[in-house]
Amino acid sequence: MQSYYGERIKMTELDRGSFGSKIGLILATAGGAVGLGNVWRFPYMAGQEGGAAFILVYIGCVLLLGIPCMISEFIIGRHGASNTARAYTKLSKGKAWKWVGYLEVLTGFLITGYYAVVSGWCLQYVYASIMGELHGDPTFVAEYFKEFSADPIRPVMWTVVIFLICHFVIIHGVRGGIEKASKIMMPVLFILLLIIVVAACLLPNAGKGVEFLLKPDFSKVDNGVFLGALGQSFYSLSIGMGCICTYASYFSRQTNLFKTALQISVIDFMVAILAGLMIFPAAFSVGVSPDSGPSLIFITLPNVFNEAFAAVPVLGRAISLLFYVLLSLAALT
């Protein structure tokens, strides 16, 4: 069985290709996990659900369920060496399991339906930051988002741009496209995160934001917190969406699956924590109550940047630009 498995992997590597380096494999697969949920959902949940207490529950969910499920998808993807639907079919002679693969494909398709649109919004806000269109009072910023999201042309245009960028990367294959792009975008994402975290933590009253995120409050831990942490761990690691299984189809037989899953989980967690240290110190420095979702990203934070850096408007525009470039990279990877 081992001989058959090894020969099969070797054969599919020659036919299908594989990642050219370990760092490229890690960054590309981690990029598939890291996304907008790390920025607009995890930090808010952590702050509202007990701070460090929620984070500990989340880590437990990742270790006990997230990583084992990721390894399972790695095994299925690497052995199947095909798209997600066919990978499940190859592993089982029965017909029932093939529908699991199709469900993962359907899940990814449904997520793409809104994810591509929101990713396009991020690109629009990169443009708006460059042109200074987000500089104004809170009412203006809220109306700007409302007007843009209701526009029948611009959101579609930016969504098309997102698909064209993805298409350009994908047509160059694994090594020349996805791996090469991830080697550039993921380090840049971390650099931008660190720059904005430092800028946010130097603001007055930034410590209150750090406390909101990290101070443990075990009195808030209940069944809802466990359920929320479990759901966030699966969503953040892209479990059950076909993404992880597809990336694993390009893994070589030398790839240590446990080590890879652990490294990806650590990177994903680091991005989520840094996102919280970026958002909440800035929000609390101007007395803004943080929220989650699109309103946090496209209404609350532009106002926070405007007010926090009101003394130096150019700096506020620069931080806003860096933030939306960061978001665009997180969405694209």
Regions found by a protein language model. Name each.
Residues 12-19, 179, 183-332:
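Membrane-embedded translocation segments of transport machinery
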Residues 9, 13-18, 44-49, 79-103, ...:
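Inter-helical loop and helix-membrane interface segments of multi-pass membrane transporters/permeases
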Residues 2-40, 67-74, 78-91, 95-102, ...:
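Membrane-interface "cap" regions at the ends of multi-pass membrane proteins
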Residues 58-66, 105-130, 158-172, 187-200, ...:
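Hydrophobic core segments of alpha-helical transmembrane domains in multi-pass membrane transport
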Residues 24, 51-58, 95-113, 179-189, ...:
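Alpha-helical transmembrane segments and their helix-start/interface "positive-inside/aromatic belt" motifs
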Residues 31-37, 77-79, 111-117, 233-240, ...:
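Short helix-coil transition sites and intra-membrane helix breaks within transmembrane domains
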Residues 21-61, 208, 242-248, 259-262, ...:
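Transmembrane helix-boundary motif of multi-pass solute transporters/channels
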Residues 37, 62-74, 78, 84-86, ...:
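Central hydrophobic cores of alpha-helical transmembrane segments in multi-pass inner-membrane proteins
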